[in-house]
């Protein structure tokens, strides 16, 4: 039996900054968990909206968040880097922006504010991990797909309360074996309940069907994406207590 879904664009703010997200909600009288979808370096695009549809088809609220600001999207590598780098360089700034998305999710109609999870792709994977590091209220799980593992260096990390899982292409040039080991060390030191799934023969951006530039280190790999998504569905059931 198919689930009836409601789709809407939502406006929210981080201080004076206007943000625009996309939400897909299953029609239900019960409160539903929320899964934030954190975009890659281009900003929110059709891929993220499709992920929100997938999340809603599982019975959860899918919320494709906006880190950059309403209407701010990259069109090439240079403009994408210009949008992303200020957040990479100032992780306190990024954390504030991400927590604005948590605040928005917590007050959505039909949302269960005690069961919020985030998934993210590339830069968005770093965002999902930063939400785990922030111990945001009601936050129970983070999934990073081909994410960046650079720690935020915002002082002493308190114990991470949510569960964490990373799906990593072993041949990803943007997350080297040294970075992977540092991530494992960081998560262990933070006493996180964490998992790392390394996928052999897999580059960066392996979930994105539009990624096809091995010389830049990015390439879609359908079997890797399928394995990651199947594992994610089990992870959702675990962290949401189903």
What do the PLM-derived regions correspond to, one by one?
Residues 1-242:
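N-terminal cap/leader regions of alpha/beta-hydrolase-fold enzymes
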